[in-house]
Amino acid sequence: MIQSITLNLPCDLSKAEWDKVTAVYGSMDGWLEEHSSWFGPWDSERFISASVEPSGLLVEGNIDPLFFRGWVTKLCAKLTEALGREVYDAEV
């Protein structure tokens, strides 16, 4: 089942901020730079991917819901630290 969450990252971050986001991506478990996703390419049986949308950073994955929740919590914590602003579910 596909899990998804939109994080409160605007699509107009500066280049320096996007560089920090990219560094956080690479520090997360399962990062596959060649696919710009984690654990597998977007169409695989197990993956997490992120895309920049007008509403924020969309993170979605075909992965166990509890694993996804924990993984996204870690991603938010790392992004918060790297960017110096709180990153969380945009719909909260």
Where are these regions (language model features)?
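Structured alpha/beta or helical-core interaction and ligand-binding surfaces enriched in interleaved
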Residues: M1-V92
